[in-house]
UniProtKB/Swiss-Prot annotation:
A zinc finger (IBR-type) spans 312-376. PROSITE patterns: TRIAD, UBIQUITIN_2. Residues 70-96 are annotated as: Disordered. SMART domains: IBR, UBQ. Zn(2+) 1 binds at residues 237, 240, 259, 262. Disruption phenotype: In brain, increased protein levels of p53/TP53 and CHPF. Cortical neurons display a slight increase in process fragmentation but no dendritic retraction. It is an enzyme of class 2 (transferase). It comes from Mus musculus (Mouse). This is E3 ubiquitin-protein ligase parkin. Residues 203-237 are annotated as: SYT11 binding 1. It is found in: Cytoplasm, Cytosol; Nucleus; Endoplasmic reticulum; Mitochondrion.
Amino acid sequence: MIVFVRFNSSYGFPVEVDSDTSILQLKEVVAKRQGVPADQLRVIFAGKELPNHLTVQNCDLEQQSIVHIVQRPRRRSHETNASGGDEPQSTSEGSIWESRSLTRVDLSSHTLPVDSVGLAVILDTDSKRDSEAARGPVKPTYNSFFIYCKGPCHKVQPGKLRVQCGTCKQATLTLAQGPSCWDDVLIPNRMSGECQSPDCPGTRAEFFFKCGAHPTSDKDTSVALNLITSNRRSIPCIACTDVRSPVLVFQCNHRHVICLDCFHLYCVTRLNDRQFVHDAQLGYSLPCVAGCPNSLIKELHHFRILGEEQYTRYQQYGAEECVLQMGGVLCPRPGCGAGLLPEQGQRKVTCEGGNGLGCGFVFCRDCKEAYHEGDCDSLLEPSGATSQAYRVDKRAAEQARWEEASKETIKKTTKPCPRCNVPIEKNGGCMHMKCPQPQCKLEWCWNCGCEWNRACMGDHWFDV
């Protein structure tokens, strides 16, 4: 297999190794190539200095993995031992390294708190798990992290957790201790260590993720989907009841589990109905599929599961909702829909075309029709004829209007919502109306125009 070595954080070169090649042997190969003493080399991978006795396989190095090798003078014995460096180590010390390696970190237990209801069985707190841990650290047979790979995979994939120095941005930082929860990984400056690059005093740790499905370069990073985890305990999906893996775990009190296919369908359905929730802090998000309170998804990259086309719609709708929440309007011309932020009280709105986005349409902010003088209601009223020599019978003029019948029908079957003024058509049925706008949803009475109440229900629920 091939591993790529970056020497002193500069250039990189490939080295051919076997799975049973030791770290000491890797140092000797690099030392011979670079013309430096092997005992001055330190091998850094995934936030830890690799001890000499471990093999490539023990260190979880995979095909085309990138390791950093730095040349630094040997430090005092107690410092070297503490970092797992050049001094010989016992098997138990090697096991300690394995348990602290980023390649063995498992944060899935922190997706669910110990006091969660209904799905606490997914936690690794039972006696079986404890007994397995007592036998010593082993590489997980499941994926601990998941990411969305924007390319070349374009889908959810297993992820690899890595760390770099916050100062020089090189993956040469050795952690003082490994992360124990998602906050350690996601919140900046929570973890520290020591950068092994020459002349770099950096101590801040910056974590990042890479796609585990294909070889990656230093710059190929992905965002972690911290709600997605392997379904090791065979929890059925809340929607289809099938047992699938991986699954998404909502952050509600019950930690409801949903498979990724059902989550995709849930998102598309809500998107089609424009039923996403606009949160001032989080943005355009969705709660638990069961409607649990305080369960909005905080990491919006989870909606990448929608796929490119639907995700583009999601971004567009989110931007539109943001404009509306800010008191703006959307251009009503079909095919445009540009977001506009006119001055407060400004009734005449122009969809500016200078920025390449607007269409130039001038419309009324209140009724969303082409701009007009006077009240919006006057658009549906017959306009008075101006003084002229040729006179016609008023009654005949009213009966001869081609579009008047349609306007009269609109008057009779359409009324504005009392709260948001969106026109709503009544096509038979009772007087109980509900505004379809996601940000309004007012339930009101068609007959009296007020919010729906028991008096309306008793007096004219089914008035014709």
